[in-house]
């Protein structure tokens, strides 16, 4: 792993936004190119600074590999392995052969979580939430954009559970890029699901606009590559099969989690009907159609009506409104925001939709007059591949940066990520968060690792 993990750790943890960094310095074991065995240790930045045998070898295609085996073991199989990449002119980061995680990343996350623990209050009404979003897993070995790194990011994010700090973790959607053939994307979702699910920490699997695989359909002008409810069938049974998550039904992706006086509600902003024409093509491109529909809204209303005594955070992939208060979804974003405002004001009424297709019409009744001591305090979302925040009608809208690698030389890379100059095998390759919601202090603290602000603080 690049030596930047050590040299910039304090800077990343303390600086609000890390500027473009200079040319990176490679790790000491990069110098071993000659086939053979070498004794390496702390001076070579080995795992845990322990003594290892470094074996350098070539495969039958002439590709150079390095493998690390502990000196104190009799096993022949290496624990860590990496290969030389001609595109980079160096070896990649060492990965654990069993789980694919990189030990230098885990060492960095050890320090990150130590810093987080020192800055949060433990006890009642201090809730910690791990947040990851927009991993855009894709079946390509990219060194500067979406690719296999998306799965690695999910596995390394799940490592945060080992510290016993998280009460909940959530992936805010766009698990996959949705640009691979259907069967491949389905297998990607299964790998991601298995890497994210947990017996230790309650988790939310939120759907993103890329998770219907419509990007592949768009580029190939073919029939729908996913059958109806493919994401839902792969991901949601696992999510709903948790005692810690409560729900009205298992059909729409709506669920909620309670801890002390905090309630976290999960929504699906890719709530789009599966309608195909006589040629097998979809009527609605889910990638371009962020929306929420009547049945899902009905479940949200039912949950809100039973939320007395709760401070509430909503989580979804897309943001319903923009910083000017306008609709940020294709359908019903502004209506969703107005419903949350009505809840905070203990109102009673009926929702209406104007100039929307029949599939997206809202006509839900709501009555929040009997709800006591409750408020929606924040709305967490991804989708935009930036960090941002705005407060409208007393609700904090907070955006989280994408975990997916966005190199500076790609058209799709947002300005925010270009400023990070993100690089493979560097701390800027990924991004993730731990959010502390302290209802006693009235603060939301957001701690970021990788291509993320180290700390953001907002009033509740």
Short names for language-model regions:
Residues 7-80:
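Glycine-rich, flexible loop motifs
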Residues 108-116, 180-299, 338, 345, ...:
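Extended active-site neighborhood of metal-dependent phosphoesterases/phosphodiesterases
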Residues 429, 436-460:
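Acidic, His/Gly-rich catalytic cores of divalent-metal-dependent hydrolytic chemistry
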Residues 135-138, 175-178, 209-214, 269-273, ...:
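Solvent-exposed loop/turn segments at secondary-structure junctions
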């Amino acid at each position: 792993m690049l030596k930047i993990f050590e040299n910039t750790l304090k800077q990343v943890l303390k600086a609000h936004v890390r500027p473009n960094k200079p040319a990176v310095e490679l790790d000491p074991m990069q110098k071993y190119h000659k086939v053979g065995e070498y004794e390496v240790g702390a001076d070579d930045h080995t795992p845990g600074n322990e003594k290892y045998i470094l074996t350098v070898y070539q495969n039958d295609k002439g590709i150079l590999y390095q493998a690390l085996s502990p000196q104190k073991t009799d096993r022949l199989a290496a624990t860590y392995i990496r290969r030389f990449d001609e595109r980079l002119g160096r070896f990649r980061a060492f990965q654990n052969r069993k789980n694919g995680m990189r030990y230098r990343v885990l060492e960095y996350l050890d320090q990150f979580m130590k810093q987080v623990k020192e800055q949060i209050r433990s006890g009642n009404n201090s809730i910690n939430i791990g947040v990851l979003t927009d991993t855009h897993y894709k079946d390509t070995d990219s060194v500067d954009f979406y690719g296999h790194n998306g799965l690695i990011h999910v596995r390394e994010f799940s490592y945060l559970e080992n510290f016993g700090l998280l009460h909940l973790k959530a992936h805010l959607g766009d698990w996959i890029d949705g640009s691979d053939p259907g069967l491949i994307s389905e297998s990607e979702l299964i790998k991601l699901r298995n890497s994210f699910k947990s017996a230790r920490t309650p988790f939310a699997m939120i759907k993103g606009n890329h998770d219907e695989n419509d990007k592949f359909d768009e580029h190939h002008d073919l029939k729908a590559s996913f059958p109806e409810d493919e994401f839902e069938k792969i991901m949601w049974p696992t999510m709903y099969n948790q005692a810690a998550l409560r729900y009205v039904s298992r059909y729409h992706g709506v669920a909620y989690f309670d801890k002390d006086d905090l309630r976290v509600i999960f929504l699906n902003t890719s709530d789009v009907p599966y309608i195909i024409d006589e040629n097998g093509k979809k009527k609605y491109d889910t990638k371009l159609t962020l929306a929420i529909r009547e049945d899902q809204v009905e479940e949200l209303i039912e949950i809100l009506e039973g939320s007395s005594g709760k401070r509430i955070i909503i989580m979804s992939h897309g943001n319903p409104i923009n910083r000017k208060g306008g609709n940020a979804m294709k359908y019903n974003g502004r209506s969703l925001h107005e419903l949350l405002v009505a809840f905070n004001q203990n109102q009673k009424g009926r929702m209406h939709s104007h100039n929307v297709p029949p599939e997206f019409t809202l006509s839900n009744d709501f009555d929040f007059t009997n709800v006591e001591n409750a408020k929606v305090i924040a709305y967490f979302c991804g989708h935009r591949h930036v960090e941002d925040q705005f407060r409208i009608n007393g609700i904090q809208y907070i955006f989280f940066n994408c975990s997916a690698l966005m190199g500076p030389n790609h058209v799709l890379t947002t300005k925010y990520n270009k400023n990070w100059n993100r690089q493979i095998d560097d701390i800027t390759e990924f991004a993730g968060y731990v959010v502390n919601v302290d209802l006693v202090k009235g603060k939301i603290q957001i701690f970021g690792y990788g291509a993320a602000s180290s700390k953001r603080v907002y009033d509740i």
